[in-house]
C-alpha cells in the first residue's frame, strides 16, 4: 500500500511539474501597424536602359495569429500566420538629360508566415525575434511614367498614368504577386500576464512583379517601425 501511495505521489508531482513547465504555452494574437521606407533595386532589364535606385515607402495593418510553445522558463517559440492589408509605393528614375521616371503603387492582401523566438526578462518585459515571408496579392494600384528634359517637364503632367484593377495587374505583370521576406525584432511591455504593447523594427525585401512586355522590374529593400498589441502568454 505504501508503494502504491509513493507511486501515485510521484506521478502527481511529475504531472504538476510538467503542467507548470508548459503553463505559458498558448494561443497568441497580435494586431499591428507598420510603416517605413523602401530602397528600390532595379532588375537587369531596368538597369540596361539606365534606371537607377529609387525611393519609396510602405505601410501595412496586419494580424498575426498562432500558438506559442514554451520551451523553458523565459524562452518560447511562436508559430504565427500573418494576414492583412499592405500599401507599397515603388519609384525609379534614369539619370540622363532626358530623365524617365516610373512609379507604381499597389493595394494588396498580405498573407505569410512569421515564426518568432520569444525571450522573457521577467516582470513586464519581453523580446521577440521573427523571421518569415509570404506574398502580397495586389488588388488595385496605379502606374505612372514621366519624362523630363534637363530636369523639367514642359507641361507638368505625366506621360502615362493608369489606374489598375486586379485584372489589369494580371494582364500587365508576371507574376501578378509580390513576394516578400521579413525579419523583425519586437519589445513587449506587458500590462497583464497576457496583454502587451509592441514596439518593433523590421527589415525586409520585396520581389516585385515584372512587366510582361518589357521585363522591367523593381525589387526593394525595406526598413521601418511597427507598433501594436499582443494578446498571449509571456515567455
Regions found by a protein language model. Give the residues of each.
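Small side chains
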Residues: 18, 26, 36, 66, ...
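Residues at beta-strand starts and edge strands
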Residues: 25, 57-59, 77, 195-197, ...
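Predominantly the C-terminal beta-signal and adjacent terminal strand-loop region
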Residues: 29-31, 40-51, 84-88, 105, ...
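Gram-negative (and chloroplast) outer-membrane scaffold detector with strong preference
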Residues: 33, 57-154, 191
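N-terminal targeting signals for Sec/Tat export/insertion, comprising classic cleavable signal peptides
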Residues: 36-64
Amino acid at each position: 500500500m505504501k508503494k502504491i501511495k509513493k507511486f501515485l505521489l510521484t506521478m502527481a508531482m511529475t504531472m504538476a511539474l510538467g503542467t507548470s513547465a508548459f503553463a505559458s504555452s498558448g494561443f497568441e494574437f497580435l494586431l499591428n501597424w507598420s510603416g517605413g521606407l523602401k530602397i528600390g533595386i532595379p532588375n537587369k532589364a531596368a538597369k540596361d536602359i539606365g534606371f537607377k535606385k529609387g525611393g519609396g515607402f510602405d505601410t501595412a495593418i496586419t494580424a498575426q495569429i498562432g500558438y506559442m510553445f514554451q520551451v523553458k522558463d523565459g524562452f518560447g517559440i511562436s508559430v504565427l500566420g500573418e494576414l492583412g492589408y499592405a500599401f507599397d509605393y515603388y519609384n525609379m528614375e534614369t539619370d540622363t538629360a532626358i530623365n524617365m521616371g516610373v512609379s507604381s503603387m499597389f493595394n494588396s492582401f498580405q498573407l505569410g508566415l512569421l515564426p518568432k523566438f520569444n525571450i522573457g526578462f521577467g516582470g513586464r518585459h519581453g523580446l521577440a525575434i521573427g523571421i518569415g515571408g509570404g506574398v502580397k496579392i495586389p488588388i488595385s494600384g496605379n502606374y505612372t511614367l514621366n519624362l523630363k528634359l534637363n530636369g523639367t517637364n514642359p507641361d507638368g503632367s505625366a506621360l502615362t498614368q493608369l489606374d489598375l484593377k486586379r485584372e489589369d495587374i494580371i494582364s500587365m505583370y508576371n507574376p501578378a504577386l509580390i513576394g516578400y521576406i521579413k525579419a523583425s525584432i519586437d519589445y513587449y511591455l506587458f500590462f497583464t500576464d497576457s496583454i502587451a504593447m509592441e514596439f518593433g523594427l523590421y527589415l525586409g525585401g520585396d520581389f516585385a512583379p515584372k512587366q510582361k512586355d518589357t521585363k522591367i522590374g523593381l525589387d526593394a529593400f525595406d526598413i521601418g517601425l511597427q507598433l501594436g498589441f499582443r494578446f498571449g502568454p509571456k515567455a
